[in-house]
């Protein structure tokens, strides 16, 4: 699937799906964005133990398919595990999905879908 330069140029924002500490840190770093009314969509989702998987999947789908202004989706790896089937099936170049560690959950490269694809590509 070829991606046009115009499509890549329009993708100027980051999105984040993460725990409260990760999202807060990234918002303080300046990634926060809300689209113009009437929909006023945020580019982040704070996930806790009470957040159901359907809400996480809906945010992931919104950031990866509906929003054409998102270039990178950052997601805590332990949250990506909750919707692993969605993360693993996302193969588009834009937006790129990157799994990041959180304060309480260390990064495990064996679970990262991007690294697994790279290993498969190089025959490891």
Swiss-Prot record:
GO cellular component, one term: vacuolar proton-transporting V-type ATPase, V1 domain
Keywords, sorted A to Z: Hydrogen ion transport, Ion transport, Membrane, Transport, Vacuole
SUPFAM superfamilies reported in the protein's UniProt record: AtpF-like
Subcellular locations according to the entry: Vacuole membrane
Classification via Gene3D superfamilies: ATPase, V1 complex, subunit F
Summary of subunit composition and partner proteins: V-ATPase is a heteromultimeric enzyme composed of a peripheral catalytic V1 complex (components A to H) attached to an integral membrane V0 proton pore complex (components: a, c, c', c'', d, e, f and VOA1).
Family statement drawn from the similarity comment of this UniProt entry: Belongs to the V-ATPase F subunit family.
NCBIfam families (alphabetical): V_ATP_synt_F
Name of the protein this chain belongs to: V-type proton ATPase subunit F
Organism: Neurospora crassa (strain ATCC 24698 / 74-OR23-1A / CBS 708.71 / DSM 1257 / FGSC 987)
The organism's taxonomic lineage, starting at the top: Eukaryota, Fungi, Dikarya, Ascomycota, Pezizomycotina
């Amino acid at each position: 699937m070829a991606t046009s330069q115009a499509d890549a140029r329009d993708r100027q924002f980051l999105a984040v799906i993460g725990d409260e500490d990760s999202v807060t840190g990234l918002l303080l770093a300046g990634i926060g964005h809300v689209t113009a009314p009437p929909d006023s969509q945020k580019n982040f989702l704070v996930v806790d133990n009470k957040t159901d998987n359907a809400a996480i999947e809906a945010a992931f789908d919104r950031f990866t398919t509906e929003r054409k202004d998102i270039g990178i989706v950052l997601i805590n790896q332990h949250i990506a595990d909750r919707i692993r089937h969605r993360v693993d099936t996302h193969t588009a170049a834009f937006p790129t999905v990157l799994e990041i560690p959180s304060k309480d959950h260390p990064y495990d490269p064996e679970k990262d879908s991007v690294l697994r694809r790279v290993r498969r590509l190089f025959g490891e």
